[in-house]
Structure formats: C-alpha cells, structure tokens
Amino acid sequence: TARLIKQHNPDARVVFIGPCAAKKLEAMRRSVRSEVDFVLTFEEMTGIFSAKHVDLENIDEDPAGVSDASTDGRNFAVAGGVAQAVVNVIKRDHPDHEVKVANAEGLKECRQLLKLATLGKYPGYLLEGMACPGGCVAGAGTMQAIKKSQTAVGLYAKKANHQFSSETEYIKELDKLVD
C-alpha cells in the first residue's frame, strides 16, 4: 500500500501506526525506507495525544474510509487472522478445495514450525507465524491486556460491512491504480 501511495503521490507522507515496535526496523530496510516515512506505536500515539491534550472520547469514531475495512482485514492483528483471511478467500473461490493451516505464536514456536516445515512435516500447508504470542495485538507497543485487545478486535471485525478485502472501496481503488 505504501509503495502504491508513493507511486501515485510522491509528496505524500506515509505513517504506519500499530502495536509492533519491530515495524520501526522493517521501515528502515533499504527496500522500504523510501516508502514509509514514520512508524509510531500505539504507546507513542498515546504520548502524543496526551501531550497535545487530545480527548479521544470526543473524537468521531469513524474517520473517512475506516468503516470500509473488511472483517478479514480487521482480524489480521490477531494470531490466526492472516491465515484465516487466506482460507476464507480460497473457500469462497474454490469451495471444494481443502486448506490445511498450521499456526505458530511467539518466536520459539515460529522457529519450531519452520524447522518442521523444512523437514517436510507440513506439505501443502499454509503456515502463519506471529512473532508475538497472541498476534500483533500483543506487540511491544500495545497499551492493554492481550485478551482485552483480542476481544476488541473480534468485536470490531464483526461490525465490518464486508467479509473480504476485495469487496471494499479502498481495495477497488487500489486495484485501479495497479491496472
């Protein structure tokens, strides 16, 4: 997304805001550096809001475009969410196709899953690994308990108007840029 934004609007400033402190290192990679200008964690955003006396309780919940996010997209931050989104699209397009999934949470489990996959223990499986146990909602820059975040994400995902990201206006606009 950042690459497309920069291609079509080179003067745009792209800011990633999320719970993942590792995104800061990722944004410094040579392949990404010119596309993402800033990375802020939720913890940093809380500090900014506090310093600027921003009262989040009195801000409209739905800035333009946010409500168009899909159920699958909203669930990305929870362990198993990315793989489930892929499975949902495969099942939609190929209902008779079996999809085998293996998930890992935390670096130790991720290493173990990759080791087993390298040894051929998961042929044909879709593998998902989340560095933080519980998923991105448990990242170093999170501000609340993991279970509370997972529940909040689940409730937010259920409110989506679309199941699949391909149904959202935002993705339709991105598709036009790619074509």
Predicted regions and their residues:
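Iron-sulfur-associated redox domains of electron-transfer enzymes in respiratory
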Residues: 1-179
